[in-house]
Amino acid sequence: MMRCLLPLLLLGSTFSFHVHAADTPPDLAARISYQDRVTSSDGIARENHWQERWIRVDNQVWSQRLIPLPLARAYHATHDATPGHKHFTHQMAARWVTRDTRGELQLRYADAWHNQLVEVPVEEYGQVAFKPDWERIRYLINPALLQEMTPLDEAAPEQARWYEKREGKQRTRILWSSRWQIPLVVESASLDGYRNYRMEVTLKSLPKQLPWLQLDGYQTLDLRDFFD
């Protein structure tokens, strides 16, 4: 669900990360805010902002882009009124990822507008731009990256610490919370200042009823049911 321009640094690493990441991180709910700004060679700056709701409980992660109701209503009204075969718009649905005891992932999307639960088989992950990187899904980044970064002695919340890495013309900073096992802030920027990305996590109370327990009555479909 997250649309970002993070450098490859944030997207993968195979090193062990037991020093920084717990095998069983605490259950958590959060609102995540994203900001991405790029200034092109013609001098025009383009800035994007978006937010998502994020919940992690045991081996389940739920993420949902927060779309203003009038915009969602207008989109679905136009989409549903269009004649012919309907395609599934995964960006308008909540993403639900679970991991079983064998380490296998299951990807589903919950479309509250149409009361549909759409299962995505492994071979179709590319259709929804899904990367089955459990560490990054569960912790928002791969915590192994912290071992490649320099810890900083900067002011930070309790049980949190800033880390930084400079590589080429790029600088990345992460405020990692060892208590909550997530980054509270991720910043990535070019040293010339023409590209900046920021992700900020605001902790919320866990809902009284988890969203994946509110799917009674949803029609279960396969993503391939929407193919032409």
Specify the residue positions occupied by each region the protein language model found:
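Sec-dependent N-terminal signal peptides
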Residues: 4-13
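N-terminal signal peptide c-region/cleavage motif recognized by signal peptidases
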Residues: 14-18
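N-terminal cleavable signal peptides for secretion/export
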Residues: 19-66, 70-72, 221-228
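Short, hydrophobic/aromatic-rich segments at coil-to-beta transitions
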Residues: 24-35, 59-64, 105-106, 155-164, ...
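An acidic-aromatic
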Residues: 45, 49-135
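A short, amphipathic edge element
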Residues: 46-48, 136-151, 194-197
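Short, exposed beta-strand/loop patches in secreted or surface proteins that constitute
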Residues: 51-56, 96-100, 147-156, 174-175
